[in-house]
Structures are given as C-alpha cells and as structure tokens.
Amino acid sequence: MSAVAENIQTEMPAPIVFTDSAAAKVADLIAEEGNPDLKLRVFVQGGGCSGFQYGFTFDEITNEDDTTMTKNGVSLLIDAMSYQYLVGAEIDYKEDLQGAQFVIKNPNATTTCGCGSSFSV
C-alpha cells in the first residue's frame, strides 16, 4: 500500500491590509515629490492620548528588519517593533467631510482616541 501525499496550498491573508485607496494616494504623493525611490513607512511610537500613536513618513531606505509590502507598485515599510502592533490592521485612505487622511483600523487596539491617531493595547 502506498501513501499519496497531497500538496494542499492555502492562501494566507496578508498580515496587514494596504488598500487600493491608500496605495493610490501614496502613488500620487510620490509622483508629486518626483522621487520614484520613495516608500511609505508606517510606524508606531510611544505618545498620543492613548499611549501609542501611528506615524507615516516617506523613506528611500529599506532597513534589514523592515517588512515590505507592495500594492499596485507602491511599497510600504514597517519596522519590526511596529509590525507586532500592526498585524491584522488595515491601512486605508479616506476623504470625507472631516477631511482627507490615512486611517489605520487596528484589531489589536483595545482603546483609541477620538481622532484615531493614537491607541492602547
């Protein structure tokens, strides 16, 4: 009797969701800067009214411990410390009556401030 091994592949969801809307806005901002080497760096740092706050910046350098995601030709960088707080999060870009901003929906956050830019775990 022979055993047949089945090769079952399941597609794992991305640990962080980078929406089409966010990628499109980042692409627009990079085009405005005129530097195609720019990548969006998303990070978490201490501060804000809830203990931690999100930050966004452009970076040309990918560090050794960065997680890199690419969506529609746009690269997103997350450092190792921030990654642990962002696993499962969605990074989106919204335009509404309150203005235009990048928004992070983070299932790890137990509380968030009213503006959504700081959180606690």
Curated annotation (Swiss-Prot):
Disulfide bonds: none annotated. Its cofactor is iron-sulfur cluster. GO terms for molecular function: 2 iron, 2 sulfur cluster binding; 4 iron, 4 sulfur cluster binding; iron ion binding. Keywords: Iron, Iron-sulfur, Metal-binding. Gene3D superfamilies: HesB-like domain (2.60.300.12). Binds 1 iron-sulfur cluster per subunit. Signal peptide: none annotated. It holds the Pfam family Fe-S_biosyn. Iron-sulfur cluster binds at residues 49, 113, 115. GO terms for biological process: iron-sulfur cluster assembly. PANTHER family: IRON-SULFUR CLUSTER ASSEMBLY 2 HOMOLOG, MITOCHONDRIAL. Homodimer. Belongs to the HesB/IscA family. Required for insertion of 4Fe-4S clusters. This is Putative iron-sulfur cluster insertion protein ErpA. It comes from Paracidovorax citrulli (strain AAC00-1). The gene is erpA.
